[in-house]
Amino acid sequence: MAQEMELAIPIMEKAAKLAKDGQTFIILGSLYLSEDKLEEAVDAIEQGLKKGKVKDESQARLTLGQAHFELQNFEKAKKEFRIAARDDDKKIKKTANSWIKYTENEEIRVKNLALRRDYIQSQG
């Protein structure tokens, strides 16, 4: 599967540049995310949203939020999840709200770990 993704990415990069809408960039961003190419995922999805004519903007926002989450850009992640949470689709709304809570908890956890690490280093 990973090998197939590696082959698909260059093709999607070319297709995204030629496409008249942003949907191909969204798909490319999802491929990047699945390959842990997080900065590339953010860039591609943002380009797709900017280009417009995206089939499911809220789903794209969820994916963008997930990429930001993985990069520990928690504020940007929550922003994207909040936009997605405005969707009329109850499933999208529920998923987005779950991600918001999860992101808030992870943000606290990461800050606490940093505080503990700093404290331990100051004692040693």
Predicted regions and their residues:
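Structural motif corresponding to the intra-repeat A-B loop/turn of tetratricopeptide repeats
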Residues: 2-3, 35, 71, 107
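Residues that mark the junctions of alpha-helical repeat units in TPR/alpha-solenoid scaffolds
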Residues: 21, 57, 93-95
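Terminal, low-structured helical/coil segments at or just beyond the last alpha-helical repeat
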Residues: 78-124
